[in-house]
Amino acid sequence: MELTPERKRSIRQRLEPHLAALDPTLHFIEVILDSERRNLGVIVQKDDRPAMLRLDFIRYVSMPEHELRATLEEQLRVKKLIGNSRK
């Protein structure tokens, strides 16, 4: 199932500030929803290195901002797109 353009835009508006705060060189590319509507795939890129981050769609809807940022940070660190925590 496809996300509506409005939903994609709202997800982008919510995620971009977190990505920029973690690393200003990270770029949000696209967001997709899996066929079972369980996971969001968030495609980001740093320099010439794209990566896909996974967010539980149901959890994302009600996830507090601090938890969302921590989730993004952890996945980016595992993928070696950012260094140690910037807290």
Regions found by a protein language model. Name each.
Residues 48-65:
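Short, charged early-sequence alpha-helical segments and their helix-coil boundaries
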Residues 17-51:
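Amphipathic, interaction-prone secondary-structure segments
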Residues 1-30, 63-87:
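Negatively charged, low-complexity tracts enriched in Asp/Glu with abundant Ser/Thr
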